[in-house]
UniProtKB/Swiss-Prot annotation:
It catalyses: tRNA(Arg) + L-arginine + ATP = L-arginyl-tRNA(Arg) + AMP + diphosphate. Its EC number is 6.1.1.19. The keyword Transferase does not apply. Monomer. It is an enzyme of class 6 (ligase). It comes from Clostridium botulinum (strain Alaska E43 / Type E3). A motif ('HIGH' region) lies at residues 120-130. This is Arginine--tRNA ligase.
């Protein structure tokens, strides 16, 4: 049962305010002794022409109390104490009935959300920074899907630019074909780094790189064939990484896809009198909005990122008619997106207000900077490998006889990394600390996965369980607190999508695991003479198991059945 909606319906019978407005005002009190839900009466003062305290007292006497243990007024607040047995029955029955679909809603029915995320550069390896956008975007994709939206996952590949001219030059000079077939990204990175090292000694190499890119732009068959090969080899490697992470996309249209779509954008901006010349470049002036000019064409007539993003935004609106278009790109790009969205708005596209930049912080790891050019990168492959190896060491120490321990180590190791990226507000930087990340205690991925495995173990050991349950028996503080947390799943998903902040759901999953462990540490489940209580508590364990599973799924993390 949706208690917020039920309370809103009851209050609506006595006040002139619409249901949605009432529901938004309903709060969950900080302390359980203050009730399970609270309604502040301040906003009703003008409508009812009474003091909030008096309104709370009047409503307390007037409202139907069915389904509630009691309703109290405390100052300007109306506090609702739900009937614990009814609340537990409604919550647990819904979770067990819905199963994997628990948490689904139709909030987004008929609306499309575009989410752009990951967007690695062709011919360059995945480093630890790439996982930030990938993890956030994948989680947002899944959460919006859960709310009934049509979601389009976009991987805006970095597959165009002057660097490809340099790469063609490097390929012609230094490539090792055998190495390229065996480990394409490694070999492409090696020759790319070598190009820059050699160009520092011989600057004419830069001219050669520009010449090859010009050939690529003008459709030279040999240059195009090499570019396509670099792209195909890179995509094959990217797919391997995405398979490990469990990430999928609906579109791989990268920067090159928009090459033939930019003239329309430039002409529209010209026709609307927005383009002006500045130092030889074509720009849109944004002085009135406290922003530097948005460069659309460079002095030599070449396009830049902004041109492509303008073309991409227009293409996506035309193709998907999105309700919201989300760009999961690092916070340093905030100004760039403000400029792009403002230019779209000035061009008369009101839907520019539906475009949102979702920024995120930096990944700090042993004080190393992530510079692809110099090859000094902390590779994602290395991070995953180390995480899985360290997890396997823990398993070999604590449970060496565990079945499929390599597969379990992979799920825990990968899950631990993803969880770390999503645990705190996305704007915060991440500092890796293996001891914390892989701990089975505290606010970590392994702790939540362990809680799931613990619940699964209880259920697997249960035998000859009564079919009769009595939810009024779940009367302890630990039991009721757990039920309340489980009932809050939908609200947390909505809060996370509203704020575009997966950490809200991550914190929620931690709360479920903590509440479950508090309950289990305080109360026996299987070792009971009361068969009805045993069956009822088992239903609570099954519900906890289901919600942890569904929550981790939305974060892009697998559960582990045994540990």
């Amino acid at each position: 049962m949706d208690y917020k909606n039920k309370i809103a319906q009851l209050i609506k019978q006595h006040v002139d305010l619409d249901i949605d407005a009432i529901e938004k005002l309903i709060e969950i009190p900080p302390k359980s002794e203050m009730g399970d839900y609270a309604f502040p009466c301040f906003q009703l003062s003008k409508v009812m022409r009474k003091a909030p305290n008096m309104i709370a007292e009047t409503l307390k006497d007037a409202i139907n109390k069915d389904g509630f243990e009691r309703i109290e007024n405390l100052g300007p607040y109306l506090n609702f104490f739900v009937d614990k047995g009814v609340f537990a029955e409604n919550t647990i029955n819904k979770i067990l009935k819905d199963g994997d679909s628990y948490g689904e809603s139709n909030i987004g029915e008929g609306k499309t959300v575009c989410v752009e995320y990951s967007s690695p550069n062709i011919a360059k390896p995945f480093h630890v920074g790439h996982l930030f956008t990938t993890a956030i975007g994948n989680s947002l994709y899944k959460m919006f899907k859960k709310e009934g939206y049509d979601v389009v996952g976009l991987n805006h590949l970095g597959d165009w630019g002057t660097q490809f001219g340099k790469l063609i030059s490097a390929y012609n000079r230094w490539v090792d074909e055998e190495a390229l077939e065996k480990a394409p990204i490694d070999e492409l990175l090696r020759i790319y780094v070598k190009f820059h090292d050699e160009a520092e000694k011989d600057p004419s190499l830069e001219d050669e790189g520009r010449m090859y890119f010009k050939k690529l732009e003008t459709g030279d068959a040999e240059a195009q064939a090499l570019w396509k090969r670099f792209r195909d080899l890179s995509l094959k490697e990217f797919e391997r990484v995405y398979d490990i992470l469990g990430v999928k996309f609906d579109s791989l249209a990268g920067e090159a896809f928009y090459n033939d779509k930019m003239d329309v954008v430039v002409n529209e901006l010209k026709d609307k009198g927005l383009l002006v010349e500045s130092n030889g470049a074509q720009v849109v002036m944004l002085d009135d909005y406290n922003m530097p000019p948005c460069i659309v064409l460079k002095g030599d007539g070449a396009s830049i990122y902004a041109t492509r993003d303008l073309a991409a935004a227009m293409y996506r609106k035309k193709t998907y008619d999105f309700y919201k278009s989300i760009y999961v790109v690092g916070s340093p790009q905030a100004l760039h997106f403000k400029q792009v969205f403002k230019v779209l708005e000035l061009a008369g596209h009101e839907w520019a207000n539906d475009c949102v930049h979702v920024g995120f912080g930096l990944v700090k790891f042993a004080d190393r900077k992530l510079s692809t050019r110099k090859g000094e990168v902390v590779l994602l492959d290395d991070l995953i490998r180390e995480s899985v190896e360290k997890t396997l060491e823990v398993i070999n120490e604590k449970n060496p006889e565990l079945e499929n321990k390599e597969e379990v180590a992979k799920k825990i190791g990968v899950g631990a990394i993803i969880f770390t990226y999503l645990k705190n507000s996305r704007e915060k930087d991440i500092v890796f600390d293996w001891k914390e990340i892989l701990s089975f205690e505290g606010e970590t991925g392994p702790y939540v996965q362990y809680s799931y495995a613990r619940a699964n173990s209880i259920i697997s050991r249960a035998e000859n369980i009564s079919s009769e349950v009595d939810y009024s028996k779940l009367s302890s503080k630990e039991e009721f607190e757990l039920v309340k947390v489980l009932a809050n799943f939908n609200n947390q998903i909505k809060l996370a999508t509203d704020k575009l902040e997966p950490s809200i759901l991550t914190r929620y999953v931690i709360d479920v695991a903590k509440s479950f462990n508090k309950f289990y540490n305080a109360h026996s489940v299987l070792n009971l003479d009361d068969e009805v209580l045993k069956a009822t508590r088992l239903s609570l364990v099954k519900s906890s198991l289901q919600v942890i599973k569904n929550g981790l799924e939305l974060l892009g993390i697998d559960v582990v059945e045994k540990m």
